[in-house]
Amino acid sequence: MVSLFDKLNAKKDGRDGSVSKELLSHSVAHTKNRLPKSGRRTSERSLAASVKDGSCSNSKSNKRNSSASVSGEEDKSCLISLNCLCCGVPLRFPASITKFRCSACQVTVIVKEPEINSNLESSTHISCTLEGLQMVVRRCHDDLQRLKKTGILDKERKGLIFQPVITYLLDRFHDVSILNRSFLVHDGGKNIKMLNYEVLQRFYSILSNLPTRKPYYSMLCCCNDLLKRITINKGENLQILQYRWLLIILNIPTIRTCLIRDRKSKNVFETQQIRAVSYELAKRCIGYLSNLSTKTSQQLIQSLRRTPTDNFSYQVEILNLYINFQFSRLLSNELSNRTAKNNVKPEDEMRSRLRRHHTTGHEFLSTRPISAQSNDKQGSGFTHPVNNKMKFKFFQYEEDWHIHSAAKLTFIYYVANTRRNGRGALSIQSFYNITLDFIDYKQDFDHWRGVAQKTKMNQLIEEWGNSTTKKCFSFCKYPFILSLGIKISIMEYEIRRIMEHEAEQAFLISLDKGKSVDVYFKIKVRRDVISHDSLRCIKEHQGDLLKSLRIEFVNEPGIDAGGLRKEWFFLLTKSLFNPMNGLFIYIKESSRSWFAIDPPNFDKSKGKNSQLELYYLFGVVMGLAIFNSTILDLQFPKALYKKLCSEPLSFEDYSELFPETSRNLIKMLNYTEDNFEDVFSLTFETTYRNNNWILNDSKSSKEYVTVELCENGRNVPITQSNKHEFVMKWVEFYLEKSIEPQYNKFVSGFKRVFAECNSIKLFNSEELERLVCGDEEQTKFDFKSLRSVTKYVGGFSDDSRAVCWFWEIIESWDYPLQKKLLQFVTASDRIPATGISTIPFKISLLGSHDSDDLPLAHTCFNEICLWNYSSKKKLELKLLWAINESEGYGFR
């Protein structure tokens, strides 16, 4: 048998002057990084009918299993309607067609009869393995070393030496079934086949470190042919039923790098051809995965929720980079037209805009440092238009199937992430895409809200003709991609419109009835009975809740431009959480508050309570705080916000609220000995401390109350078989059943405020908590960021002596003092959810001379007023007096 090494030596000796050129058996149809034209001539292998929006063209194939030609007299009743498996575009074609091509994404679909006797044992055992590749590569390296010793090594011979690697890859990557059997590992005995991502990464790493690019490029081209010509069985409802092969292709390393334009990269595997083919793989993998059937999508979700965190995060990042890439193309085209006259390169203009964006205090809009920030460093070609005129309009992406498919697939990953309990779930920030901060969110939101409120007539018009129609797209349908900053902007936009509408209606009513109708929702309260006065005003003005809020404190000067409103929220929540009210209990072990199980004077049989209306008041207050962009000082667990967002609760939520009890429950669950009942001796009951007994020390009530968790629970012992059910009912009792009347009253007040506000649906529980409570800092505030956005009034500047002293003093203070200062200036010791750099902070000069007076604060405008004090020590002393001895509007 003649080896490859002998053949190469034979060429040197002149015995065999021919060198095989069959290095690639598969070719890529499109190697330029652009969309293929719909009218482009197909290759001989993909002659098919081009189908789009119900139009078909007759074609013939030169293959043995040729597609049936379509007669122009085909009965229209035999037409099949479906969405493209890759791009989702609606298609209609005759049932007799066995091969068709979508002219939008250029994918050819071959429909074949299912194989009845498919017992091809020789092929069912073939799979792509790391060991197989290592063996082939090792032999090729041995041949390479021997060839180096002969001194006849050149580029062409080096490529021929690694021809066995190319053959191995083409044999494995040409078939979907082979790829689906490759790189598998079983997950914990649950009979779920998972991809072994560690092995897969090592597999690609070997290919990336070969001395030639040809094997890697051959694999890419083979994958591209596989994705461009998909074969499905007739009995599968024309759907893709397998997904693992798509994940294998999606994890090819150059798919990520092709979405980042790094012009300084010296990697030999980042050539233009490799980047172009890698992009083709990216867009079709994302397209196929986003259009899987419901059943297959559920299987994909089950697989993703068990995927290692690093690999899961990597795939989410690819989706965000892909969206960035699509918007960069939109922006590049626009900037090319704008900069042509000025002879400025679009890439330079975009990078300039990106640098300006990252120096204007808007870093909070995205917390994804990898995909968002690395793009700038590596020259991704995308920048963010800081000019309001430079917004992505809705029509630019409304019909873009690339963006649609990426958003749909990101939704699948988001759902999988919510189910990754104990498996390293990503935070919501990992799904944020900073690019979307620069869409025209008003158009997008109006379109989304318009679709949600579409009339029956419009629906009938769309369905006329009984044709397959595409669903309307809007990024508001995928809110997890939108950053918290743009969601807040959307909410402020809707709230502003609602308030303007309410004010307009009040004005029209006043004209119609000839009497004065207030355009504001005014609340007049006394500090000592703030809860009673607030509840009375809210009850008397139920129809005014959506108007702009104005607060007035009795016998106190002050016009509410925002500061009085903050003060009212702060004092009212403090009053509602007063332990003597008995509305909420404070749990020391978790430092969290929760609804009291037995509020004072609560009659369970009638569901009435003299103080139950205060829960309604608290719900209204929380809603008004969001509605009026005010932060509340609350210490609720995540369970409350999950309940508000209709998200399922878990044992982890109970653990956050009652950590000590949850540890004991876990110990019970982990106990597996046979003497379980003798050791624990428990029944389906729970005992809690009576809140009324704590408040009133009443002899008529018991200190502890025992409740059955199920029917006849006192006689149902806890065993090894039902201990999980016991824990489930225990958690359900404390988080739901025991507080149901109180919570229902609270949520009715909350929903009363947001009855007409759709934007609240954009927030999940994590974001809602930040929206209500702000961004909680653990140790110190970032006053350097605040200083960078501070404005100076009255003669002060950033380098003024008193100003420099001020910043030095507050940065040296401990956290409690910093909170007091923030409370003094802004009427809240919390910073906004979007970060401290978004506070419109001001420092103004009261007088150019020294003074013994204390500093002043205008909480309506987040402004502190300083005298030009003579020394740093004096300034610090005056600040301490001001923040510790002030309350209300006037010193006491």
Curated annotation (Swiss-Prot):
Catalytic reaction list: S-ubiquitinyl-[E2 ubiquitin-conjugating enzyme]-L-cysteine + [acceptor protein]-L-lysine = [E2 ubiquitin-conjugating enzyme]-L-cysteine + N(6)-ubiquitinyl-[acceptor protein]-L-lysine
Primary location group: nucleus
Compositional bias annotation for Low complexity: 55-70
Swiss-Prot/TrEMBL keywords: Nucleus, Transferase, Ubl conjugation pathway
One GO-annotated biological process of the protein: protein polyubiquitination
GO cellular component: prospore membrane; TRAMP complex
Molecular-function annotations in GO: ubiquitin protein ligase activity; ubiquitin-protein transferase activity
Gene3D superfamilies, sorted: Hect, E3 ligase catalytic domain, Hect, E3 ligase catalytic domains
Renumbered residue ranges of the record's region Disordered: 31-70
Domain HECT: 792-892
SMART domains listed in its UniProt record: HECTc
Superkingdom per UniProt: Eukaryota
Enzyme Commission designation: 2.3.2.26
Entries under InterPro entries matching the protein: E3A/B/C-like (IPR044611), HECT_dom (IPR000569), Hect_E3_ubiquitin_ligase (IPR035983)
Active site: residue positions: C860 (glycyl thioester intermediate)
Bias-annotated ranges (Basic residues): 31-40
SUPFAM superfamilies: Hect, E3 ligase catalytic domain
One Pfam entry name: HECT
Protein transport recorded as keyword: no
Subcellular location: Nucleus
Function, in words: Probable E3 ubiquitin-protein ligase, component of the TRAMP (TRF4) complex which has a poly(A) RNA polymerase activity and is involved in a post-transcriptional quality control mechanism limiting inappropriate expression of genetic information. Polyadenylation is required for the degradative activity of the exosome on several of its nuclear RNA substrates.
Record family assignment: Belongs to the HUL4 family.
Subunit structure as annotated in this protein's UniProt entry: Component of the TRAMP complex (also called TRF4 complex) composed of at least HUL4, MTR4, PAP2/TRF4 and either AIR1 or AIR2.
The name this protein goes by in its record: Probable E3 ubiquitin-protein ligase HUL4
Originating gene: HUL4
